[in-house]
Amino acid sequence: MDTSVPVISSDYIHSARTEYKLTNDESPITLQFPSTLERTRVRIMGKCMKVDHVVIEYRNQVPFNAQGSVIVTIRDTRLSDEQQDQAQFTFPIGCNVDLHYFSASYFSIDDNVPWQLLYKVEDSNVKNGITFAQIKAKLKLSAAKHSTDIKFKQPTIKILSKDYGPDCVDFWSVGKPKPIRRLIQNEPGTDYDTGPKYRPITVQPGETWATKSTIGRYTSMRYTRPNPIDIDDSSSKQYTSEAEFPLRGLHQLPEASLDPGDSISQTQSMSKKDIESIIEQTVNKCLIAHRGSSHKDL
């Protein structure tokens, strides 16, 4: 992988045009990267690198009536095995094409170069092991002090054979996942646990406050919330206990124990004379009680 082409330039790093044998299994395509000396120079400068542009030149060496599809895949080995594919191209085995891929991510000089180019042939009438094409890869790199957002540019295919058109080729590029916010859940007892001590109670339709109230639940504790409790208490025992939900049976008390009595509109009205009589009796009882306590002190 030695080359005299500097990393920070507008030139491409060319790999040798190499003949490749037909195979149904994924096999690597040679992609020339900067020499160890050149990468060390960029590392000393304290910069990171980015693959700006990859060009894969495919030139077939098959009979006129050869059939089959060539599949070229670009991978980033920094990801898990099932998510490494970044782009993929498919085209007929007899079609001469130039494949263009534009990167959208940076990588560190301290790590191994993460990019891989792979090819395979499917549904072909050409025998396995036969040399079927020459492939040459060109790579353009750039260096930066730090990474920045890169505008996505879709991969393209340039068809060079007159017998083939856009309907004969296809390409795909990986999509960017939707960002998801991860909420912070502190462990109980930490110094930075300054939030409310108890979770707010949310009463859903068909539930009561008594069935949802709990004790001893900290906001920062990670636990699986129990399923909503049935009003008839048919399934609550398998999720809760009396210690966790001490008020869950409150809604089952008889109505008489919760009855505050008749409202003022349901009681008989009292006259002024009745009120004066009640006050007079109360005052007399207080005076008699006071006189009795005074005689005892003497």
Curated annotation (Swiss-Prot):
GO BP annotation list: transport of virus in host, cell to cell
PTM annotation: Phosphorylated.
Q: Which GO terms describe its molecular function?
A: DNA binding
What is the top-level taxon of the source organism?
A: Viruses
Keywords from UniProt, A to Z, are:
DNA-binding, Host cell membrane, Host endoplasmic reticulum, Host membrane, Host microsome, Membrane, Phosphoprotein, Transport, Viral movement protein
Q: Which Pfam families match?
A: Gemini_BL1
Q: Name one GO cellular component term.
A: membrane
Subcellular localization is given as: Host cell membrane; Host microsome membrane; Host endoplasmic reticulum membrane
The record's listing under InterPro entries reads: Gemini_BL (IPR000211)
Q: Membrane topology type, per the record? A: Peripheral membrane protein
Family that this chain belongs to: Belongs to the begomovirus movement protein BC1 family.
Q: How does it assemble?
A: Binds to dimeric supercoiled plasmid DNA.
| Function statement | Transports viral genome to neighboring plant cells directly through plasmosdesmata, without any budding. The movement protein allows efficient cell to cell propagation, by bypassing the host cell wall barrier. Begomovirus genome is shuttled out of nucleus by Nuclear shuttle protein (NSP) and the movement protein transports the DNA-NSP complex to cell plasmodesmata and facilitates further movement across the cell wall.
- The identity of this protein, by name, is Movement protein BC1
